[in-house]
């Protein structure tokens, strides 16, 4: 069997890993073994946090909507506000509601007043 000289292939693989880990600090960007370990760890963290990011943003939107609805006084809680939105078939998602709550509170107050007026009629 002939001998395989792996110089170019191995170097190219290490350079690719080094470029990925170039922003890491200390030995994590210089030593081959630690860079490969850190690359694996970084990829695992990014995969995990993509799922976590969705949960965190949903929690943030709910907190913002809840703060404004409690300020308003029409609905005493977020859950009642969302329940009445669904009952009236006003399908606004939480992201849009949170954006309205921050940028234009009066618009959210108008929505909540409209829901409460419909409730009184029924």
Swiss-Prot record:
Coiled-coil stretches noted in the UniProt entry, renumbered to this chain: none
Domain of life: Eukaryota
PROSITE patterns: RIBOSOMAL_L20
One GO CC term on file: ribosome
Main localization category: plastid
Cellular compartments annotated: Plastid, Chloroplast
GO molecular function: rRNA binding; structural constituent of ribosome
Stored InterPro entries: Ribosomal_bL20, RIBOSOMAL_L20_CS, Ribosomal_protein_bL20_C
Biological processes annotated in GO: ribosomal large subunit assembly; translation
Keywords (A to Z) from UniProt: Chloroplast, Plastid, Ribonucleoprotein, Ribosomal protein, RNA-binding, rRNA-binding
Family: Belongs to the bacterial ribosomal protein bL20 family.
PANTHER family referenced in this protein's UniProt entry, alphabetically: 39S RIBOSOMAL PROTEIN L20 (PTHR10986)
Xref: HAMAP family: Ribosomal_bL20 (MF_00382)
Role played: Binds directly to 23S ribosomal RNA and is necessary for the in vitro assembly process of the 50S ribosomal subunit. It is not involved in the protein synthesizing functions of that subunit.
The name this protein goes by in its record: Large ribosomal subunit protein bL20c
Gene: rpl20
